[in-house]
Amino acid sequence: MGDRPTVIALHHPPFHVNSDWLDTSTLQNPEELFAVLERHSQVRLVLFGHIHQEFNHQRHGVHYLGTPSTSIQFEPQSSKFSLDRKYPGFRLLNLYADGNWETWIERVAYAHQLNLAATGY
């Protein structure tokens, strides 16, 4: 990987996100990923999706950032499938050569029809 600040992007979260039904879809071997990352201090960020919600966590100096969906949002910290009323969104990043970064979430004001009685997606 070299010494340059590095960002890694995944689809599935590498650990639980405190949502019982989503926590069944994490990486199957997260400890292997963590072991590699701990040997490469230039990794500053790990980005992931799948959870359709904003999520921030830090572990051993690495920031893990979950990203909302450009479609429907899932209710954070829910025990079963549940939709959130938040608008679709996405995460933006500014990455700097010195390894610093900033991030924020943008929401799209789109009033889509939600089926709040849905039991899956």
Regions found by a protein language model. Give the residues of each.
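His/acidic metal-ligating clusters that form di-metal
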Residues: 1-65, 119
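Binuclear metal-dependent phosphoesterase catalytic core
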Residues: 36, 58-121
